[in-house]
A protein has these predicted regions:
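N-terminal accessory regions of nucleic-acid-interacting proteins
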Residues: 16-21, 225-281
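Short linear loop/turn motifs
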Residues: 54-58, 250-255, 417-430
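Conserved DEDDh/DEDDy metal-dependent 3′-5′ exonuclease domain
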Residues: 56, 70-113, 119-180, 311-425
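Structured nucleic-acid-interacting core domains from mobile-element enzymes and related host factors
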Residues: 62-72, 274-285
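Acidic, Mg2+-coordinating catalytic module of metal-dependent nucleases/exonucleases
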Residues: 149-156, 160-222, 406-470
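Metal-dependent catalytic core segments for phosphate chemistry
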Residues: 281, 289-328
């Protein structure tokens, strides 16, 4: 569903082409769908599979015909009823009913020893009964909408089982969920489409939307508060009658008003009274990890002693190559740390927002045979420094405190300003296929990130010159 004003703009500007980012997302979705379809069982003596093709109407009719014929597995299904339609990656028969199948590039479930979630290997979908797996479901609204609409389409033919199948970044596991859990949210989302807004409001997705060039001038003419506080972040001020950035400034509400003024004046960062430089050490390294979706970490980049050291694999993740690469990185890091301590010197490894690194340190250790206590000892030690926590304590900014926001203020510049996390996902796919230019771009991007971390801490240690007080 997403931004409802996009539907208005789509009618106004039907010829505006899709952005590169949206085309890349579509390519990734197609690749995910193809990967799952290749795993699903083929037709056999007692199992019939049909792969639908053709235009939208042809697939809608073929979906109904295949269900009427009792086909066990139907891929590329489509329903259209009552003003809505839904594209499904498949339908799988269960007794006299069907389950809608969706393939998502989200992480749809997380391992949890205290939870259970029914699931089945993807290649056994439609052939084996689900088993309780130690996972906890993760909710993503758009996935829930598709499952609910798929269930409603099945209800029109009295073939709804009440359950659906979702396959996420782990393409080899299909999880079974209760589709009724998504009905209420989907009904609310559909209801909002009956009363479309007459003006835009900035949300996170605007950055990659093809209609932003038309919405931005409208928002600027209105001085809309969402320019500064996108999405629901400005709701509490709207409820107080404050709808513009200038109105928030004049309200004199302390930090929010000061940051609104900084936004209006183009000031990216202000120094808090609690400013303090980060911990420093005799031996220092900066670390940044790159992962591909939820499949694994393929690059551990390190800046040490004025040089960049990438520990990288371009092979598919989850196998020996990823394990060998992580072992090489972990051995290098622990040996450097141990040697430093043996000399009686201090050691510090820095990263910017450690959540991702901590996750993949733990996950890699679990999958590739490194003792968890080694990882936990490092993560919880003073030698592992999350620079973002120092930045958060020391600064406030109207655009947040991401690495891409803070590092330029500290004097750092990336080789490619517009190469971001989504671009890296696209480049990773090309790199695995052997594209040397994509590999070089990923290494350059990662090198820029570790250098940015280094630059920020050096700048903070010098007192963050040039930054005004909050």
């Amino acid at each position: 569903m997403g931004c409802r004003y996009r539907l208005v703009q789509r009618e106004r500007y039907p010829d505006v082409p899709s952005t590169h980012a949206s085309l890349a997302r579509a390519e990734r979705a197609d690749a995910a769908r193809a990967a799952v379809h290749s795993l699903l069982s083929s037709s056999s003596k007692n199992f019939r599979r049909v792969d639908l093709g053709g235009d939208d109407f042809a697939r809608e009719m073929a979906t109904l015909e295949a269900m009427a014929a009792g086909v066990h597995l139907i891929t590329n299904a489509r329903f259209r009823y009552g003003g809505w339609y839904v594209e499904l990656d498949g339908l799988v028969r269960d007794g006299e009913a069907y389950l809608p199948i969706i393939v998502s590039n989200h992480r749809v479930a997380k391992k949890n020893p205290h939870a259970t979630l029914p699931g089945v290997p993807t290649h056994r979908l439609g052939l084996s009964a689900p088993l309780d797996l130690p996972y906890k479901l993760r909710h993503h609204p758009v996935d829930g909408y598709r499952l609910a609409l798929g269930a409603w389409g099945l209800q029109e033919s009295d073939l709804d089982s009440g359950r659906g199948v979702v396959i996420g970044q782990d393409r080899e596991t299909a999880f079974v969920v209760e589709t009724g859990d998504y009905f209420e949210a989907t009904e609310r989302a559909l209801a909002t489409l009956e009363d479309l807004p007459d003006s835009p409001r900035r949300v996170k997705e605007c950055a990659s939307c093809r209609f932003w060039e038309f919405c931005r001038p409208e928002l600027e003419r209105m001085d809309d508060i969402s320019l500064f506080l996108p999405g629901d972040r400005g709701r509490k001020y709207r409820e107080r009658g404050i709808h513009t950035v200038h109105g928030l400034i004049e309200a004199n509400l302390g930090e929010p008003s000061r940051l609104a003024e900084a936004w209006e004046r183009g000031i990216p960062l202000l120094k808090r009274p609690t400013f303090a430089p980060p911990r420093r050490a005799d031996v220092e390294v900066d670390i940044d990890m790159e992962a591909y979706l939820d499949q694994g970490a393929y690059l551990w980049g390190v800046w040490h002693d004025g040089a960049y050291h990438p520990f990288v694999t371009w092979q598919p993740l989850g196998g020996a190559s990823e394990g060998e690469n992580f072992h090489e990185f972990w051995t290098w890091l622990t040996e450097l740390r141990s040697a430093t301590h043996a000399r009686g010197e201090t050691f510090a490894a820095y990263c910017y927002s450690a959540h991702g690194e901590n996750h993949w340190l733990r996950s890699s250790a679990e999958r590739f045979g490194i003792a968890q206590n080694e990882i936990e000892e490092f993560i919880t030690s003073e030698d592992w420094v999350d620079l973002f926590l120092d930045v958060k304590r020391s600064f406030a900014g109207p655009h947040g405190l991401s690495l891409k926001t803070v590092a330029p203020v500290a004097g750092h510049a990336w080789a490619e300003d517009d190469f971001d996390g989504e671009a890296s996902v696209n480049a990773r796919r090309a790199a695995v296929a052997g594209d040397e230019s994509a590999r070089a771009r990923l290494l350059e991007y990662n090198c820029g990130d570790v250098q940015a971390t280094y630059r920020i801490r050096e700048w903070m240690s010098a007192g963050a010159p040039g930054i005004g007080d909050l």
